[in-house]
Protein backbone atom coordinates (compact mmCIF):
# COMPACT_ATOMS: atom_id res chain seq x y z
CA UNK A 1 0.00 0.00 0.00
CA UNK A 2 1.38 3.41 -0.95
CA UNK A 3 2.00 5.70 2.01
CA UNK A 4 0.10 8.97 1.36
CA UNK A 5 2.66 10.84 3.53
CA UNK A 6 5.64 9.92 1.35
CA UNK A 7 7.90 12.56 -0.19
CA UNK A 8 6.76 13.54 -3.68
CA UNK A 9 8.57 11.87 -6.55
CA UNK A 10 9.89 13.73 -9.59
CA UNK A 11 10.64 11.00 -12.08
CA UNK A 12 12.58 11.84 -15.19
CA UNK A 13 13.51 9.70 -18.17
CA UNK A 14 15.41 10.95 -21.22
CA UNK A 15 16.14 8.63 -24.14
CA UNK A 16 17.83 9.23 -27.48
CA UNK A 17 17.93 6.64 -30.26
CA UNK A 18 19.88 6.41 -33.51
CA UNK A 19 20.79 3.72 -36.03
CA UNK A 20 24.20 2.12 -35.61
CA UNK A 21 25.56 -0.88 -37.51
CA UNK A 22 22.18 -1.92 -38.81
CA UNK A 23 20.25 -1.66 -35.53
CA UNK A 24 18.61 1.17 -33.63
CA UNK A 25 20.55 1.84 -30.42
CA UNK A 26 19.69 3.66 -27.22
CA UNK A 27 22.68 6.02 -27.38
CA UNK A 28 21.71 8.25 -24.46
CA UNK A 29 19.63 7.62 -21.37
CA UNK A 30 19.15 9.67 -18.21
CA UNK A 31 17.09 8.11 -15.44
CA UNK A 32 15.77 9.73 -12.30
CA UNK A 33 13.75 7.43 -10.01
CA UNK A 34 11.12 6.17 -10.05
CA UNK A 35 11.35 6.11 -13.86
CA UNK A 36 13.68 3.66 -15.55
CA UNK A 37 14.24 2.16 -19.01
CA UNK A 38 15.40 -1.33 -19.88
CA UNK A 39 18.24 -2.04 -22.28
CA UNK A 40 17.35 -2.51 -25.94
CA UNK A 41 15.87 -5.84 -27.02
CA UNK A 42 15.71 -7.18 -30.58
CA UNK A 43 13.78 -9.88 -32.42
CA UNK A 44 16.15 -11.65 -34.78
CA UNK A 45 17.37 -9.41 -37.59
CA UNK A 46 14.67 -6.77 -37.01
CA UNK A 47 16.53 -3.47 -36.40
CA UNK A 48 13.72 -2.17 -34.16
CA UNK A 49 14.83 -1.45 -30.59
CA UNK A 50 12.24 -2.58 -28.03
CA UNK A 51 12.57 -0.83 -24.66
CA UNK A 52 10.45 -1.36 -21.55
CA UNK A 53 9.50 1.67 -19.45
CA UNK A 54 9.32 1.04 -15.71
CA UNK A 55 7.92 2.95 -12.74
CA UNK A 56 9.48 1.52 -9.58
CA UNK A 57 7.31 3.32 -7.00
CA UNK A 58 4.22 1.25 -7.78
CA UNK A 59 2.09 4.25 -8.67
CA UNK A 60 1.70 8.02 -8.50
CA UNK A 61 0.20 10.02 -5.63
CA UNK A 62 -0.71 13.68 -5.16
CA UNK A 63 2.15 15.99 -6.09
CA UNK A 64 4.17 13.38 -7.99
CA UNK A 65 5.45 14.30 -11.45
CA UNK A 66 6.86 12.12 -14.21
CA UNK A 67 8.60 13.49 -17.32
CA UNK A 68 9.53 11.32 -20.29
CA UNK A 69 11.50 12.78 -23.21
CA UNK A 70 12.23 10.68 -26.31
CA UNK A 71 14.31 11.62 -29.36
CA UNK A 72 14.59 9.52 -32.50
CA UNK A 73 17.33 10.32 -35.02
CA UNK A 74 16.78 9.81 -38.75
CA UNK A 75 15.95 6.22 -39.62
CA UNK A 76 15.48 5.07 -36.01
CA UNK A 77 12.95 2.30 -35.33
CA UNK A 78 11.72 2.10 -31.74
CA UNK A 79 9.02 0.20 -29.87
CA UNK A 80 8.27 1.39 -26.32
CA UNK A 81 6.30 -0.72 -23.84
CA UNK A 82 5.13 0.25 -20.37
CA UNK A 83 5.95 -2.61 -18.03
CA UNK A 84 2.60 -2.36 -16.25
CA UNK A 85 -0.51 -0.26 -15.82
CA UNK A 86 -0.07 3.28 -14.48
CA UNK A 87 -1.79 3.46 -11.09
CA UNK A 88 -2.94 6.84 -9.79
CA UNK A 89 -3.46 6.75 -6.02
CA UNK A 90 -5.93 8.87 -3.99
CA UNK A 91 -5.13 12.55 -3.59
CA UNK A 92 -5.20 13.12 0.16
CA UNK A 93 -3.73 16.63 -0.22
CA UNK A 94 -5.92 17.80 -3.09
CA UNK A 95 -2.92 18.10 -5.44
CA UNK A 96 -2.77 16.56 -8.90
CA UNK A 97 -0.09 14.14 -9.98
CA UNK A 98 1.16 14.94 -13.47
CA UNK A 99 2.80 13.21 -16.39
CA UNK A 100 4.45 14.96 -19.33
CA UNK A 101 5.66 13.06 -22.41
CA UNK A 102 7.58 14.77 -25.22
CA UNK A 103 8.67 13.00 -28.41
CA UNK A 104 10.81 14.37 -31.25
CA UNK A 105 11.13 12.30 -34.43
CA UNK A 106 13.53 13.02 -37.29
CA UNK A 107 13.13 12.02 -40.95
CA UNK A 108 12.01 8.41 -41.60
CA UNK A 109 11.98 7.61 -37.87
CA UNK A 110 9.40 5.14 -36.58
CA UNK A 111 7.93 4.96 -33.08
CA UNK A 112 5.47 2.40 -31.74
CA UNK A 113 4.04 3.07 -28.27
CA UNK A 114 2.11 0.03 -27.13
CA UNK A 115 -1.12 0.60 -25.23
CA UNK A 116 -1.26 0.10 -21.49
CA UNK A 117 -3.91 1.09 -18.97
CA UNK A 118 -4.07 4.21 -16.80
CA UNK A 119 -6.07 3.47 -13.63
CA UNK A 120 -7.19 6.45 -11.52
CA UNK A 121 -8.11 5.18 -8.04
CA UNK A 122 -10.85 6.58 -5.83
CA UNK A 123 -10.25 10.32 -5.11
CA UNK A 124 -7.30 10.44 -7.54
CA UNK A 125 -6.41 13.60 -9.49
CA UNK A 126 -4.31 13.23 -12.63
CA UNK A 127 -3.07 15.45 -15.46
CA UNK A 128 -1.28 14.17 -18.56
CA UNK A 129 0.28 16.13 -21.42
CA UNK A 130 1.70 14.36 -24.47
CA UNK A 131 3.34 16.23 -27.35
CA UNK A 132 4.67 14.55 -30.50
CA UNK A 133 6.76 16.46 -33.05
CA UNK A 134 7.58 14.54 -36.19
CA UNK A 135 8.58 14.86 -39.82
CA UNK A 136 6.37 14.13 -42.81
CA UNK A 137 8.40 11.01 -43.62
CA UNK A 138 8.25 9.56 -40.08
CA UNK A 139 5.74 7.04 -38.71
CA UNK A 140 3.89 7.00 -35.38
CA UNK A 141 1.63 4.27 -33.97
CA UNK A 142 0.50 5.15 -30.44
CA UNK A 143 -2.09 3.47 -28.23
CA UNK A 144 -3.54 4.13 -24.80
CA UNK A 145 -6.39 2.96 -22.54
CA UNK A 146 -8.13 4.78 -19.68
CA UNK A 147 -9.95 2.79 -16.97
CA UNK A 148 -12.81 4.04 -14.78
CA UNK A 149 -10.90 2.98 -11.66
CA UNK A 150 -10.35 -0.30 -9.82
CA UNK A 151 -13.52 -1.85 -11.17
CA UNK A 152 -12.99 -5.17 -9.38
CA UNK A 153 -13.08 -3.27 -6.07
CA UNK A 154 -16.24 -1.45 -7.02
CA UNK A 155 -14.46 1.81 -7.86
CA UNK A 156 -16.14 3.12 -11.00
CA UNK A 157 -15.61 6.82 -11.76
CA UNK A 158 -14.87 7.53 -8.11
CA UNK A 159 -11.75 9.60 -8.89
CA UNK A 160 -11.82 13.38 -8.53
CA UNK A 161 -10.37 14.44 -11.88
CA UNK A 162 -8.71 13.02 -14.98
CA UNK A 163 -7.33 15.39 -17.61
CA UNK A 164 -5.22 14.62 -20.66
CA UNK A 165 -4.03 16.55 -23.68
CA UNK A 166 -2.54 14.78 -26.69
CA UNK A 167 -0.96 16.78 -29.53
CA UNK A 168 0.74 15.73 -32.75
CA UNK A 169 2.73 18.14 -34.91
CA UNK A 170 3.96 17.23 -38.40
CA UNK A 171 6.54 19.65 -39.79
CA UNK A 172 5.51 22.04 -36.95
CA UNK A 173 1.86 21.97 -38.08
CA UNK A 174 -0.66 20.78 -35.49
CA UNK A 175 -2.64 17.93 -37.05
CA UNK A 176 -4.19 16.36 -33.94
CA UNK A 177 -5.32 17.73 -30.60
CA UNK A 178 -7.31 15.49 -28.27
CA UNK A 179 -8.43 16.77 -24.89
CA UNK A 180 -10.19 14.73 -22.21
CA UNK A 181 -11.31 16.33 -18.96
CA UNK A 182 -13.40 14.17 -16.66
CA UNK A 183 -14.78 15.25 -13.29
CA UNK A 184 -17.11 12.38 -12.37
CA UNK A 185 -18.80 14.21 -9.50
CA UNK A 186 -19.86 16.95 -11.92
CA UNK A 187 -20.71 14.84 -14.99
CA UNK A 188 -23.31 12.27 -15.95
CA UNK A 189 -21.28 9.73 -17.92
CA UNK A 190 -24.43 7.77 -18.80
CA UNK A 191 -25.81 10.74 -20.73
CA UNK A 192 -26.19 10.58 -24.49
CA UNK A 193 -23.01 11.76 -26.20
CA UNK A 194 -20.72 10.98 -23.27
CA UNK A 195 -19.77 7.41 -22.37
CA UNK A 196 -23.37 6.18 -22.11
CA UNK A 197 -22.93 2.55 -20.90
CA UNK A 198 -19.18 2.34 -21.53
CA UNK A 199 -16.53 2.29 -18.80
CA UNK A 200 -13.22 2.16 -20.71
CA UNK A 201 -11.79 4.40 -23.44
CA UNK A 202 -9.20 3.20 -25.94
CA UNK A 203 -7.33 5.29 -28.51
CA UNK A 204 -4.96 4.53 -31.34
CA UNK A 205 -3.15 7.24 -33.29
CA UNK A 206 -1.57 6.37 -36.64
CA UNK A 207 0.50 8.96 -38.52
CA UNK A 208 2.51 7.92 -41.58
CA UNK A 209 3.01 8.89 -45.23
CA UNK A 210 1.61 5.41 -46.03
CA UNK A 211 -1.78 6.19 -44.48
CA UNK A 212 -2.90 7.57 -47.83
CA UNK A 213 -2.76 4.01 -49.20
CA UNK A 214 -5.20 2.66 -46.60
CA UNK A 215 -8.87 2.14 -47.46
CA UNK A 216 -11.06 3.72 -44.78
CA UNK A 217 -13.95 1.34 -45.43
CA UNK A 218 -11.64 -1.63 -44.90
CA UNK A 219 -10.35 -0.09 -41.67
CA UNK A 220 -13.89 0.49 -40.44
CA UNK A 221 -14.70 -3.17 -41.06
CA UNK A 222 -11.46 -4.21 -39.38
CA UNK A 223 -12.07 -2.22 -36.21
CA UNK A 224 -15.68 -3.35 -35.77
CA UNK A 225 -15.09 -7.09 -35.53
CA UNK A 226 -15.89 -7.25 -31.80
CA UNK A 227 -19.62 -6.60 -31.37
CA UNK A 228 -19.42 -5.82 -27.64
CA UNK A 229 -17.38 -2.66 -28.33
CA UNK A 230 -18.25 0.66 -29.90
CA UNK A 231 -15.48 1.64 -32.30
CA UNK A 232 -14.79 4.07 -35.11
CA UNK A 233 -12.01 5.34 -37.35
CA UNK A 234 -11.55 9.00 -38.27
CA UNK A 235 -9.28 10.28 -41.01
CA UNK A 236 -7.55 13.42 -39.73
CA UNK A 237 -5.37 14.20 -42.76
CA UNK A 238 -4.03 12.27 -45.74
CA UNK A 239 -1.36 10.87 -43.42
CA UNK A 240 -3.16 10.53 -40.08
CA UNK A 241 -6.04 8.50 -38.67
CA UNK A 242 -7.48 8.10 -35.18
CA UNK A 243 -9.23 5.02 -33.83
CA UNK A 244 -11.36 5.14 -30.68
CA UNK A 245 -13.12 2.45 -28.68
CA UNK A 246 -15.69 2.56 -25.90
CA UNK A 247 -15.95 -0.64 -23.88
CA UNK A 248 -17.68 -2.14 -20.86
CA UNK A 249 -14.76 -4.31 -19.81
CA UNK A 250 -10.99 -4.08 -20.07
CA UNK A 251 -9.92 -7.50 -21.31
CA UNK A 252 -11.84 -7.35 -24.58
CA UNK A 253 -10.76 -3.76 -25.23
CA UNK A 254 -7.10 -4.58 -24.57
CA UNK A 255 -7.30 -7.55 -26.92
CA UNK A 256 -8.93 -5.55 -29.71
CA UNK A 257 -6.71 -2.48 -29.50
CA UNK A 258 -3.62 -4.72 -29.54
CA UNK A 259 -5.01 -6.61 -32.54
CA UNK A 260 -5.56 -3.34 -34.40
CA UNK A 261 -2.12 -2.13 -33.30
CA UNK A 262 -0.43 -5.18 -34.80
CA UNK A 263 -2.50 -4.87 -37.98
CA UNK A 264 -1.32 -1.29 -38.39
CA UNK A 265 2.32 -2.15 -37.76
CA UNK A 266 2.07 -4.83 -40.45
CA UNK A 267 0.41 -2.48 -42.97
CA UNK A 268 2.78 0.42 -42.32
Swiss-Prot record:
GO terms for cellular component: cytoplasm. GO terms for molecular function: nickel cation binding. Pfam families: UreD (PF01774). InterPro entries: UreD (IPR002669). It is found in: Cytoplasm. HAMAP family: UreD. Belongs to the UreD family. This is Urease accessory protein UreD. It comes from Lysinibacillus sphaericus (strain C3-41).
Amino acid sequence: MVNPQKINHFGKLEMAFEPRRGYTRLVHVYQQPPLKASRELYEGSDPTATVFLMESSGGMVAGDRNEINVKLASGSRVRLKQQSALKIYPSHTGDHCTQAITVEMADEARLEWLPEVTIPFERAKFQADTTIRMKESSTLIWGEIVAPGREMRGEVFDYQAYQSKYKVYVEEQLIAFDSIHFKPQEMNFAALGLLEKALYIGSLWIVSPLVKNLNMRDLQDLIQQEQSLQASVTKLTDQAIHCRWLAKEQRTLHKEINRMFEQMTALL
